[in-house]
């Protein structure tokens, strides 16, 4: 049984086995949580991402998929990079967003991670409404068959934390 915990804070400070990065498909860093993870984790993460691009993901990591790299200088063993979908307005299909969580947990199992910190994937510049994103995230984690013992949602601001708190119950 996976325990879900909520934290308001900085995901780059979480002492967990794996930190999930809401990456862009290039895997080369960007803004928001992606940029923060690359900055705090140091060059080892970028180098590992470049190697992945050269060996497996020449066109970039597809939306909804996940892949692990070293965590570099972060207080974790792994960073699991996943590419969330961009909100296209009402009627947007949440399937790819749910896939980000399922695939990240699958990769966590592959690397032996027992504690995983997730951001609120796609709720920043990708504009997914927090209420729906929280519901999709929590449902995907609860429905997942995984050896991960703790999923920690690390929410940057109080409003997002409150929404996730309402969904988790």
Residue ranges of predicted features:
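Glycine-/small-residue-enriched capping loops at alpha/beta junctions
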Residues: 1-110
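Phosphate/ribose-phosphate-bearing ligand recognition and processing surfaces
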Residues: 86-169
